[in-house]
Structures are given as C-alpha cells and as structure tokens.
Regions:
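Gram-negative outer-membrane beta-barrel transporters
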Residues: 2-93
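Short, P/G- and charge-enriched loop/turn segments at secondary-structure junctions
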Residues: 4, 55-56, 98, 143-145
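Residue-level preference for beta-strand/loop junctions
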Residues: 11, 31, 62, 104-106, ...
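Hydrophobic, well-ordered secondary-structure elements that form the walls
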Residues: 17, 37, 70, 81, ...
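Active-site lining segments that contact anionic ligands and/or coordinate catalytic metals
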Residues: 65, 76-78, 105-109, 119, ...
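Structural motif
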Residues: 73-74, 102, 116
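C-terminal beta-signal and adjacent terminal beta-strands/loops
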Residues: 85-92, 113-162
Length: 162
C-alpha cells in the first residue's frame, strides 16, 4: 500500500504565460481560425535526497510545460489540433526505495466536429496521434526503468438534443 504525503514546508514559485487570439483579421476562410499558447515554469526550494543520495524535488511537478492549440470554427465545422509537452519529473519511489523519474513527454491531439443541424453534432477525437510512449528511469537517465505505451485513442460520437 502506497500513498502520497505532504513533504513539509516548501515554497513553490512559478509563472504562467498565456496567449489566445482569434485570427479574425485574416481573409476567409482563415478568419475562422485561432491560436492559443501557454507556457508554465515552476520552481520549488524543496530538495530531498533518496536513499542512494540522488536529489529529488516535488513529486509530479515539471519545471517547464507548454501547450499549443490551433482551431477552426464556423457554423458547421469545428476543428482543433493541440500539442501538450512537459519536462521530466520525479514520479515516485520504486520498490527498492530509489527515485523514479518520467522523461519529457509530448502528446498531439486532434478533434473534429460537424453540426448537421443545431441539434445534431458528430464528433471525432484522436488522442496521442503520434502514439507517444512514456519513458521512465531510475535516478539517472542512463538507468532505464520502464516504457509505457499509451496507444492512440479514437472516439466517435453523435450528440442529439431532443
């Protein structure tokens, strides 16, 4: 049985920069597009040493992460492509009481929607388009620990308002 516990006092500092802009100034049909960008930086003064003397910070926190989204939307069609990325981070302790880290990870997602009428919409969503895998290491990057393939997930739905 494992659980996460508070690490005691620490200071977490960070900054988030966000930009969102509909591109209505462009000629048709590009005037129905838009862009959204986001960057986050976090830093903590918490530094713990593992049983083997390797430093780890806050669990599940990446120092850097960003998201980029392009979208299109008109009366009938909506489309969105998004890329999300995060730095490596301290994940958990292994059974040997060593630190497990996840390497940097990025994922591309795409979604489409078509409005047949105002009450009937078909949607297609594809997550992890590039079939990116999560990679883990133990304390130093050269010490491979695991590989988790998330596969590409495709969802299709039809929504009808009665």
């Amino acid at each position: 049985l494992q659980t996460k516990v508070n690490a005691g006092d620490t200071t977490l500092k960070g900054v988030e920069l966000a930009f969102q802009q509909p591109l209505t100034m462009l000629p048709a049909p590009f005037d129905k597009t838009g862009v959204q960008l986001n960057y986050t930086f976090t830093d903590s003064d918490l530094l713990q040493l593992t049983k083997y003397g390797y430093p780890v910070g806050l669990q599940d926190f990446s120092e850097n992460s960003y998201n980029a989204v392009l979208w299109y939307e008109d009366d009938k069609l909506e489309a969105r492509i998004a890329y999300n990325w995060r730095d490596d981070y301290y994940d958990t302790l292994t059974q040997a009481n060593a630190a497990q880290f996840q390497k940097p990870y990025g994922q591309l997602d795409v979604s489409l929607g078509y409005h047949f009428t105002k009450d009937i919409v078909a949607r297609l969503s594809v997550k992890n388009v590039q079939n990116e895998a999560e990679r883990y290491y133990q304390e130093i990057e050269e010490r491979f620990l695991g590989y988790k393939l998330n596969d590409t997930m495709v969802n299709f739905s039809i929504q009808a308002v009665l």
